[in-house]
């Protein structure tokens, strides 16, 4: 069982959604993750929101014209997410992820990597990488008090990914070693006959 389900009991979907609705109503920008991801995409790119929760990031990316799927294994979160018909929703544990499609970009926002079941981190990053097309990007963000940037880099490297960029926030603040947040972008390598088309 993931640390998220252990800590929440899989029952926080409605309250989580309401908290973000209140933030948005107060004028707060609740689309920082989607803004960063959208800046890495081309029109119509296929996106997987891994650990999508209530679908906040996935729904916003779909609204912007991208082909989006979301996956989570918290039933209360997916209940909220499924209210949006513009996204394909999957109920699956990321440690067992085996979807019938591949993506130009996989995003794991909102501390997904630090809420995984202990000991599954490497397998999850490997499975996320396997869902990328050659040249595809894995974008992850988390609090650094629960996992260091270096530890995540090791997971990504072992999954065959190459580092592309790192920031201290979803607003692309330059990386600092003492940052509270880490947002990392890694790429699945391309071979000469598997080039991502422009």
Task: Write out the residue ranges for each language-model feature.
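Conserved beta-strand signature within the Rossmann-like core of class I S-adenosyl-L-methionine
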Residues: 135-142
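Class I SAM-dependent methyltransferase SAM/SAH-binding core
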Residues: 54-96
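A short SAM/SAH-binding and catalytic strip from SAM-dependent methyltransferases
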Residues: 105-119
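Core SAM-dependent methyltransferase catalytic element
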Residues: 176-198
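A short acidic, Gly/Pro-enriched loop at the edge of an enzyme's catalytic core
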Residues: 95-105
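A short glycine-rich, Lys/Arg-flanked "PGG" loop and its adjoining helix->strand segment in the class I
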Residues: 122-134
